[in-house]
Amino acid sequence: YTTLFRSQLIYSKYKLSAPAQKLVTTVISLVQEEDESNKEYSILAKDFLELCGTKTNNREYLKDACEEIFTKPLKIKEPKGWLIVNWCSSIRYIDDQGTIKFKVSDELKPYILNLKNNYLKYDLKNILPLKSEYSIRVYEWLKDIYNSKERYNKKMIEEFEIEFLRERLIIPDSYNTNNVFTRVIDKAKEDLEKHTDIRFTYQALRKGGGNTFTHIE
């Protein structure tokens, strides 16, 4: 599977578990330009679990992921404000077929269809082995940065404010700055090196004259 969506989508504000992120990204990969607006997209539960390398056949695993996708909207930054939108308008699980059926929200479709520039494309095999929700998001950000800088032949260096990471990833307030490094950035670095086509190094920066790290590069 290859997924394609507008770069704006990956920098939106949302919090989904790793299984829910993998499931919704798999659904997005099925959407085609010529599809009818009310089309349902089907995924066999066993196929999805195999793709993720999950040995369990527990329906609760999928049920929880589906409920997350339906109940946790995303907040997309727009030129004049924000758009809060659900990933799907409906999710149906058919017991005897072991099939999950999704209807993608109409308001989300401009971010996944008819894309001519400023879009991200990657192979799903890179995120399916990842266990951390943060590692998946960091992979998508870095993949987008890599693609855009390669396109314009620029240096592969990017700077993020730690507060930006906290806001967009909805990192709990209980995570201090050190936790952000060890449980989010370092974990993502380890996961991406082991499972994906992205490698990165980083350094923490202090800006503004204080003793606290405020940025990473």
Q: Could you tell me what each predicted segment is?
A:
Residues 2-217:
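Charged, alpha-helix-forming regions
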